């Protein structure tokens, strides 16, 4: 019985560590983003938006560290990633800026989805994790499409040329 207990204590962390997934370069790039600087001349609203972004970024980094140590699960990372991306988009007021940020996020989602599909096939991640990621990606694509539509509606319609 003691031998079994020792085996669990000694080898279980190793088994957990082996199941930690490799993350795509774009995901790791997001996690290396520095926090936003709070400036004295920030409006109260902008300051709060920056604080929210920084909180989501710090949580993402902390959860990633927990994940690497086997102390949290992939859905927690996907969820905080969604909050981080949402907070980043909300930093921008102009639709063109929002579209640019959403396009960058879509690149991250595409790379992460491809990576996660491989992990599901290898038995290292669940189909449920992949579907959660796909749901978030589809939500982002809807936001991007709506943003692009609002940009095109702001553009003046071309005037017919006089004959």
Tell what function each PLM region has:
Residues 15-17:
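Boundary at the C-terminal end of the N-terminal hydrophobic targeting segment
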Residues 19-40, 44, 161:
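Short N-terminal segments immediately surrounding and downstream of signal-peptide cleavage
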Residues 152-163:
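Terminal, low-structured helical/coil segments at or just beyond the last alpha-helical repeat
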Residues 45-78, 83-85, 98-141:
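Charged, solvent-exposed structural "stalk/scaffold" segments
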Residues 85-99, 138-154:
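Amphipathic alpha-helical coiled-coil segments
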Residues 32-50, 87-99:
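Short, charge/polar-rich alpha-helical segments
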Residues 1-9:
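Bacterial N-terminal signal peptides
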